[in-house]
Amino acid sequence: AGDEVITCSFSFFATAEAISAVGATPVFVDVDPATYLIDIDQIETAITPATKALMPVHLFGRPVDMSRLMAIAETHNLKVVEDCAQATGAHWNGQPVGSFGDVGCFSFFPTKNLGAAGDGGAATSNDDALAQTMRELAVHGMPKRYLHTALGYNSRLDAIQAAVLNVKLPKLKGWIE
């Protein structure tokens, strides 16, 4: 309540929806007209005492300047949640998108560059405790079978979607090139 998350004004509705779903308010920053990605120069001026996180949106297979964005996040002690739905397989300075911030979010909707046959997605984190919490929440809040310690969700990828992605994933690099 009262928390703000800075994100890009040019994205699918799901970006702002995810922010609102946790009770925060999306604060929109315009795009850089040269890249159509979040204008890094505008982020710092949008930060207020209520700002808790940045949510950059990597679009068109192009990554946001994560060096500059992460420096801003570090300066202001902000969390970073990367929206990688439109840039699976993209890299910034040799590092894959989704591996810079606290969380990376990916979509496998059929229209994405790594699309399944239906809906699906993944979240990544380099923080072991956070990754474990995400895994538990994805299976109804269960850290082990039939033990529910939190109110979770049914966010498991079904076998058919996984099979489609298993066939497509080795081809992703070639498709990107």
Predicted regions located by residue number:
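PLP-dependent aminotransferase-like
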Residues: 1-84, 91
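Short, hinge-like loop/turn segments at secondary-structure boundaries
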Residues: 44-46, 72, 96-100, 123
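Active-site region of PLP-dependent enzymes
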Residues: 87-93, 100-177
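A generic hydrophobic-helix recognition signal that picks specific residues
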Residues: 51, 75-77, 95, 120, ...
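Hydrophobic/aromatic ligand-binding patch that stacks against planar heteroaromatic rings
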Residues: 17-19, 72, 96, 113, ...
